[in-house]
Amino acid sequence: MRSQLSAPIDTTNFYLSLLHETDFDDLYAVASDPLLWEQHPERDRWRKDVFVLFFQSALVNDLGCFVIREKSSDRVVGSTRFYGLDELGGLVRIGFTFIERSLWGTSANAEIKNAMLTRCFGPFKAVLFDIAPSNRRSIGAVNKLGAIYSETLSPTKAVYRLPKSHWIRQS
């Protein structure tokens, strides 16, 4: 199961491959935009000293972490990952996703998430998304996929649940 989740993902416009230490500079070039983090609980993740900690945790994530490359240019445009695997409960989480602002408002996030969800909905019955209640942009994105609010775990974390039966494929 773990190896299936961490295998590269190929979409029409993007290629998701496992993150490596050598990806730091390219990924930080995307993450260094303060506006990416304005609705995020860790609003200073654009700072290099803060991003280093995020990057290090991504490298040791037990399901790996993806760097997202735009196929047309081979440019790094973001990152995402699977985490929180619950094989008995048939659940996995998708998150820690960010993409460069030039892709906001395009079909990029939907294309990437749909490919990840396609992989999940063979073995899993639902996918969870942990999102800060203040992050309207991310909440809107998962709502478009069919995810519904489940519970608030803390002031900085609400859970949105996407059962396979509710998934709305975005094109």
State where each predicted segment sits.
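GNAT-family acyltransferases
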Residues: 1-105, 114, 118-122, 126, ...
